[in-house]
Regions:
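Carbohydrate-binding surfaces of carbohydrate-active enzymes
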Residues: 181-195, 199, 206-215, 220-221, ...
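N-terminal carbohydrate-binding accessory modules
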Residues: 14-95, 129
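Bacterial Sec-dependent N-terminal signal peptides
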Residues: 1-14
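Aromatic- and glycine-enriched glycan-recognition loops and surfaces
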Residues: 72-90, 111-132, 232-233, 543-552, ...
Length: 732
């Protein structure tokens, strides 16, 4: 196992844009079956296979409550997919949802939009096939923008090299600019050709497959394009989807321009509600539902992302340590969605994962556990138990509740913090929703209506349904949760790792010249590992190095630059949002140049698109100046290759003669560890984690794989090592 660490003390914060979720413009509105549908049935290519009305999703002529789990195949090692699918199936889910990141599937730059030689869609095809094998419906979300706390929001690093000199708008990504649309078609063509054979409409009746195809993502976040241009963009994306034989319903999320379109390809499109309300469910989730009902009359309520946890960011708290993410919240928010009439819910995330290598967005932790029901390491937890109980409820009652009407009911409650809402099915069955958002105590009491009285007992922040069949005098409380899982008491041995050696990273022996104004991605290097730079500057002068500074990109911290002259590091002289300055040693009166070696650390590519992100899209230093004059640069990108090689038992390259000065203080160090894992007891499984205390930032490599980044600032100190990458019973 190898750690490549630059010993720096840094800080980091990533501020997520919550503007869409916190929009306060919605009017109060209650849907009770009185709206007229605006859906033209012709929008459904195969209404006999899949369609929807204002209350329910219908598959092969039957109402189906879509109980969906977000599972990112690109965040879980492929040999472990089957384990996660099995747990989803056992958890009662009937659907799985995934983003499809463009940059994951096309890692090298094609020559033109017609060049498909750099695309590799096999992993997506394998994932869709496995979902079908487990009997799950699938929702696909190919962006092109996916957010997902993923590098570049899913856009390839090379995409900005395709941006024309003149564009329709200052910001290019997610615009209807003609050249950008050509590249969108390039991507969608590949996705559609992969997805099309897996659609439900291409399967025999009774089989599962892809049921929804989402175009774009969270488009309300984009405020810098006119609404007419945004709508045109969505229309053209939808036309591309249909052109390449996607015939299941098209959906969107957080996209006003797709709401209530009376004709054309967007007619009938459901714009889904995404909500992460934590403890304030009725206030925050309820407001978004009201907005959806007001702006999408006659459309079903579907949640594209309902809170199943939350991300962790560098310098913040790990997911399970955050407030408002307890499993009881999952039950409460689900029952509130049912109370409001939802017919489809996708929980983001349900399967936790890992931001392997450098794929995480700017300053995101390596772990993407998300406090999900199925953890990053594959274990299940109390949230999973809640989902199992909710799944049984939805299987028996989900579509009946969705088609039930809200009846006005006057009631008194002995506990003023407990509220009641009644939905009544067409056959007279009653569903009394009993909820509280008070979370400091248990709630015991009695509710009395004009014709019925019952006692309740709720946990803190509890929610239950009292189900009263038509004509019955007594009912049942739902959901019924399964017993907690009994776990083996066998524990894995803790293995204390002793470093085999600490090695200074040898300076590169080969350097590549950069043209003025170019970045290393212009040479086809798209990774964001450490980069060495070299230049020659007049001694005694002030060196200015251009890089992303503190809070320049969505409040994140600065990229780091370590500068060395004559084998010694230089302290930072001063810095601002755009540059960091170093005082070069020597007498400026003597006209002599010194060699300057720099190590650059990128904090990653942000997952939001906006002009400032596009302006700083390139990988590496923006410039190096001295006395106002821009200096020529050479670079070497060696750390990633060395890490993979060393972790497989290789050696650092031998020193060879080079004109570069050897460093007394290395800019980058390697820490090598080896260990033997014992065989696991028969019938017992446990995951392995690396617990790491360290200074500086770096990358973790093991057995030829890059696990991800390690950040001095934390909060992550334990790193899940996929068992399929470990040599169980042997040396690692």
């Amino acid at each position: 196992m190898l750690l490549g660490i630059t010993p720096l003390f840094i800080s980091a914060q990533n501020i997520t844009d919550m503007a869409v979720m916190n929009d306060r413009t919605a009017d109060a509105f209650i849907e009770n079956g009185t709206q007229i549908s605006s859906i033209d049935d012709s929008v459904f290519v195969h209404p006999d296979r899949i369609c929807y009305d204002r209350r329910c999703i219908r598959i092969e002529g039957k109402d189906v409550f879509v109980f969906s789990a977000a599972f990112h195949y690109f965040r879980v090692a492929q040999p472990l997919w089957a384990d996660r699918f099995r747990k989803l199936k056992e958890g009662g889910f009937n659907c799985v949802e995934t983003y499809i990141p463009w940059n994951w599937h096309e890692r090298r730059m094609p020559r033109s939009p017609q060049d498909e030689s750099c695309l590799d869609m096999k992993e997506l095809d394998d994932f869709l096939k496995m979902a079908e094998d487990f009997g799950l419906y699938v929702i696909v979300r190919p962006g092109p923008y996916i957010c997902a706390e993923w590098s570049g929001g899913g856009f390839p690093q090379w995409i900005m090299q395709k941006k024309p000199a003149k564009t329709a708008f200052d910001t290019w990504l997610q615009s209807n600019d003609p050249e950008f649309m050509r590249w969108n078609e390039h991507w969608y063509r590949a996705v559609c050709r992969t997805v099309a054979p897996h659609q439900l409409t291409r399967k025999e009746k009774g089989c599962t497959g892809v049921i929804f195809f989402q175009v774009e993502n969270e488009f309300n976040r984009i405020k810098w394009f006119p609404k007419e241009a945004k709508k045109d963009y969505l229309i053209r994306l939808s036309q591309i989807v249909r052109k390449y034989e996607i015939d299941v319903p098209v959906i969107t999320c957080w996209t006003d321009e797709a709401r209530n379109v009376e004709e054309g390809v967007l007619n009938g499109v459901v714009d889904m509600v995404n909500s992460y309300p934590r403890w304030e469910i009725e206030k925050n989730f309820g407001r978004l539902i009201n907005q959806q009902l007001r702006t999408q009359p006659g459309k079903p309520l579907i949640s594209g992302e309902l809170q199943g946890g939350w991300m962790s960011e560098v310098g913040g708290k790990l997911s399970w340590e955050q407030d408002g993410l307890m499993p009881v919240q999952t039950q409460n928010i689900t029952l509130y969605a049912l109370q409001r009439g939802f017919c489809g819910i996708n929980y983001y995330m349900t399967v936790g994962g890992t931001n392997f290598d450098d794929w995480g967005a700017r300053q995101m932790t390596t772990t993407y556990d998300y406090a999900a029901a199925i953890a990053e390491n594959g274990s299940t937890n109390e949230r999973y138990r809640r989902f199992r109980g909710l799944a049984h409820l939805l299987k028996e009652h989900g579509t009946r509740i969705a088609r039930a009407d809200v009846l006005p009911v006057e009631y008194t409650s002995t506990d003023p913090d407990v509220k009641l809402v009644l939905r009544q099915a067409s056959n007279g069955d009653r569903y009394y929703f009993v909820r509280t958002e008070e979370r400091t105590r248990h709630h015991f009491g009695t509710i009395q209506t004009s014709d019925f009285t019952f006692d309740f007992a709720l946990e803190p922040f509890g929610a239950m349904i009292y189900y009263l069949p038509a004509g019955a005098e007594q009912g049942d409380w739902l959901p019924e949760l399964p017993d907690a899982e009994t776990r083996p008491t066998v524990k894995a041995d803790t293995i204390r790792l002793i470093p085999d050696k600490r090695m200074a990273d040898p300076l590169p022996t080969r350097w590549v010249k950069l043209k003025k104004g170019e970045y290393i991605d212009h040479d086809g290097i798209y990774g964001r590992h450490f980069v060495y730079y070299r230049t020659y500057a007049p001694q005694g002068k002030l060196l200015e190095v251009g890089r992303i500074g503190h809070k320049l990109i969505n409040g994140t911290d600065a990229d780091e630059v370590v500068v060395s002259v004559q084998g010694k590091r230089l302290p930072v002289f001063k810095e601002d949002a755009y540059s960091v300055f170093y005082q070069l040693p020597g007498d400026s009166a003597i006209n002599r140049k010194v060699e300057v070696v720099m190590l650059f650390e990128s904090k990653g590519l942000h997952h939001h698109t906006k002009k400032i992100v596009e302006d700083y899209w390139g990988i590496g230093l923006n410039y190096v100046r001295c006395g106002g004059k821009e200096l020529s640069l050479e670079y070497a990108y060696t750390e990633n290759e060395r890490g993979l090689n060393l972790s497989k038992g290789g050696r650092l390259q031998e020193k060879t003669p080079t004109e570069t000065t050897e460093l007394n203080e290395p800019l980058l160090s390697w820490y090598s560890y080896s260990f033997t894992l014992p065989e696991q007891p028969r019938g017992v499984w446990f995951p392995y984690h690396l617990r790491l205390e360290h200074s500086g930032n770096g990358f973790i490599y093991i057995n030829g794989h890059c696990i991800g980044r390690c950040w001095q600032k934390g909060p992550q100190r334990e790193y899940y090592i996929p068992e399929c990458w470990l040599n169980i019973g042997g040396e690692n």
